[in-house]
Amino acid sequence: MSEQNPTDSKNPELKKHTFEAEVAQLLHLVTHSLYSNSDIFVRELVSNASDACDKLRFEATNDDSLYEDDGELRIRIAVDEDAKTITFTDNGIGMNEADAIENLGTIAKSGTKAFLDKLSDSQKQDGQLIGQFGVGFYSGFIVADTISVETRKAGDAAENGVRWVSDGTGSFTVENISKTERGSSITLHLKEQYSEGEDGYLDRSKIKRLVNKYSDHISLPIQMRKEIWQEDEVEEGDDTPANGQMVLTDEWETINKASALWTRTASDVEDDEYVDFYKNITYDMDAPLTWTHNRVEGRVQYTQLLYIPKKAPVDLYTREQQHGLKLYVKRVFIMDDAEQLLPMYLRFVKGVIDSADLPLNVSREILQESRDVKSIRDGNARRILTLLASLANSEDADKQEKFAQFYAEFGDVIKEGVGEDMGNQERIAKLLRYATSTQDGEMTSFEDYKARMKDGQKAIYYLTADNLAAAKNSPQLELFKKKGIEVILMTSRVDEWAMNFLTSFDETPLQNIAKGAVDLGDLQDEAEKAEAEKAQETMKPVVDKLKAALGDRAKDVKVSTRLVDSPACLVVGEGELSPQMIQMLKQMGQDVPESKPTLEVNPDHPLIKKLESSEQSAEDFDKLAQVIFDQALLADGGQLEDPAAYLRRVNELLMK
């Protein structure tokens, strides 16, 4: 029995169109990279059908004539063994000709082109990576050599139906048809290898299993034709067992639970169901790292189902890329990527918010200004931070491992919250983890650092650098190593920015040991202080000559109390930008305020003592002064303005 829906083509002249370049590129990736996970076309096409019904429901809140006397929304899947086709039909919003060309012939999703362009050759072979992106309608070409779409937009006349057909190789055709029912039917003409055998998709029981696996949570009924067992008739008195077969009926039966997963109580939902739902809404082939599902009561009532992914998406640091949660109001789908429901530093969180209090006609502009939305956003932030804290502070090894995984993927993004979410700054600070100068290979929290502070230590000391090796070998660290004082080593680009906002932790000040004067307080004895004051006097002539030689390269020159082995280091004032920060801002094309470092010199180093030598000519003194400054700049992670001049000076001094 054929399960196709007949339509009448009344325009034999086909309009041929060429796919947008990005679509052709995506189609190539889909057919060549996702063949090992061909099942996903069921998930993708059912999801699209569900979205179409959600959009109709939303539009009909203002104009219920769009239902056309058929308000029972549904998705139907029909298998035709003779024609070797599978058809996915919905009675949702449908498309007109312009919609079909735009939605099926171009990629409108923001950032898609950039995503495709950034993929390396090896990444283009990574089916998992492509699958995370979400291939939607085009996934049908994994199993089909031709796809035809018959559609009519809700509210349009029957004669304004559209047929769209493509073999996925570079072009598609569009023609006008008559279609009595609104919505869309997508028919996949299966490739030979997918129409028979164990890889085939003409087995109705297999399609049912895939729907149960990927789409059981869809709140609409997903229906297939009912099959019944029909026995052969035997003559009366004949003891021969009756043979029989499964027979397809005209009755449609619902094959999914047809209830929104988030509307059920958490205790009634299995972990596998949560995982399947996550994969369906995110296109991520990995299970989520963890999740939280709650019904929030109060001035604003809403349900939150929030997931933390296992891996960071490729566009995580593209802040203009759309991020956010799916928003429903009273189970009516409103929008994807509702970024107003999460602070920016939690943009990696996925999931669903279903509110009972927001208006159905809510727009992004209304979301921006709504007090209720702010309440939901704040509640979501607290919930995620509480979830992360439960992992971070757990004694359970599995939970500790989960937090370590989370921090490796999303730690830098969380740090943005230190400056963006002052209300939760303390919660966020408790989640931060860093390497230190004394804890080899282990990450430390501020709380753990405080517990190990020396008697008399008044501050949490930290140092920022481009990488861990640079931090461990920094000249600024030498005095602290000598005295056995632990220093937190911050090696992310966002760290210095974040520390501008986080000036203390649990009432203990944080001090960057590369900025301003180093005051060890009770950790420095009186003899050391007296020796430092004496060095300031004896070195004054050399310091003055260095100031003159360096000119406007240095803000000042001082005798250092922080150096042990190195001849010199650069120090910036409190509140000023480090060389690394200046370099990063310049690379981002931002205007950077003029900032000059102070050169600190080690009076006990042979190279500095050489500057005191009366045998040193004025020319050689100037050269050595420049070399010492440049070496300090390099040790601090900065870049030389004129590397050739530096090398020339070094070579000239070596030949003396």
Curated annotation (Swiss-Prot):
Keyword Chaperone set for record: yes
Q: What is its main location?
A: cytoplasm
Stored Pfam families: HATPase_c_3 (PF13589), HSP90 (PF00183)
In this chain, the stretch annotated as A covers 1-364
Compartments in which it is found: Cytoplasm
The record's listing under NCBIfam families reads: PRK05218.1
What disulfide bonds does the UniProt entry report for this chain? none
Keywords of this entry: ATP-binding, Chaperone, Cytoplasm, Nucleotide-binding, Stress response
Region ranges (B): 365-583
PANTHER family per UniProt = HEAT SHOCK PROTEIN 90 FAMILY MEMBER
Taxonomic lineage is: Bacteria, Pseudomonadati, Pseudomonadota, Gammaproteobacteria, Moraxellales
Name the family the entry cites: Belongs to the heat shock protein 90 family.
Instruction: Return the annotated region ranges for C.
Output: 584-656
Q: What Gene Ontology molecular function terms does this protein carry?
A: ATP binding; ATP hydrolysis activity; ATP-dependent protein folding chaperone; unfolded protein binding
What's the protein called, per UniProt? Chaperone protein HtpG
